[in-house]
Amino acid sequence: MRYLEIRIRCQRAAADAVGNLLLTLTGAGYAVDDPLIVEQNRSRWDMTDLPPGDPEWVTVSGWLPEAGDVEQQRLRLETGLDEIRSLGLGAVDPARFRWVEEEDWAHAWKAYFRPTRVGDRLVVVPAWEEYAPQEGELPIRIDPGMAFGTGTHATTALCMRWLEELVTPGSRVIDVGTGSGILAVAAKHLGAAEVVAIDVDPVAVDAARENAGRNGVEIDVRLATLDQVAEGEADLIVANIIASVIVDILPDVASRLKPGGRFLASGIIAARKEAVTEAMTDAWLLPVGAREQDGWVAILAMKP
């Protein structure tokens, strides 16, 4: 089915009235693109590709199904917009229209997820695809669902390539912010004796457990934060999250690593590299290396 997308740019004071008009016409709600929300939160995000916008203006959108009387609804829309303009709430631009196709968003992304070699041995494989590993390959079968990435993003790839060098047989690994569990599965495939995977999101915990089962590995997946994991036991802690959270957990990282243990931190934009490195030093962790890909950085530190 096709839908007629309606986009109306208006001043903030008129947004509620425009939204209510679209709600009445479509019966299915509306969306508001608000640059003020972006600006208020920009400092909290490591990155955003949204350009600054005029905070006095927003864009309100709604969608009409092709099956309805679209032309009649367009006439009702124009009449309604004229009425809103007459109220003097704020300027309302003419509506813009375009046809959009309905897609099965829950499955369309799968067409772009293919087996991908990430390191020398690790290969990320969609759970629904047949794959015959070549000699020496370690396939990781992942179904990320709609909530997690496919494991091929630069932040994850940096971690996986480094894990191939860092994980030793018999080691204990903690994966902080495990998400789909891909790094935990990788560590287990590479020979770790024990892997603890933690996340604060119940959806992530369920996904990680399912992906561990798909790969036939035993992983201790917990709904927990790092301070709830026993101290002084880990040979390696890996965290592919964001810079601000990495900095926040550094004291807990230091107390949970064995002497000589390593901390692998990823999910850091290049602009935050120096700040994270300095924070590691302040937490008595010695930065020993950094690698960059596509503007993202992974930093390796050691507990003396």
From Swiss-Prot:
GO biological process, one term: methylation
One annotated GO molecular function: protein-lysine N-methyltransferase activity
Signal peptide: none
UniProt keyword Signal, yes or no: no
Amino-acid positions noted as binding S-adenosyl-L-methionine in the UniProt annotation, renumbered to this chain: 156, 177, 199, 240
Annotated GO CC locations: cytoplasm
Domain of life of the source: Bacteria
Entry EC number(s): 2.1.1.-
Keywords: Cytoplasm, Methyltransferase, S-adenosyl-L-methionine, Transferase
Subcellular location: Cytoplasm
InterPro entries reported for this sequence: Ribosomal_L11_MeTrfase_PrmA, Ribosomal_PrmA_MeTrfase, SAM-dependent_MTases_sf
Reactions catalysed according to its record: L-lysyl-[protein] + 3 S-adenosyl-L-methionine = N(6),N(6),N(6)-trimethyl-L-lysyl-[protein] + 3 S-adenosyl-L-homocysteine + 3 H(+)
Family: Belongs to the methyltransferase superfamily. PrmA family.
Known function: Methylates ribosomal protein L11.
HAMAP family per record: Methyltr_PrmA
NCBIfam families, A to Z: prmA
Name the record gives this protein: Ribosomal protein L11 methyltransferase
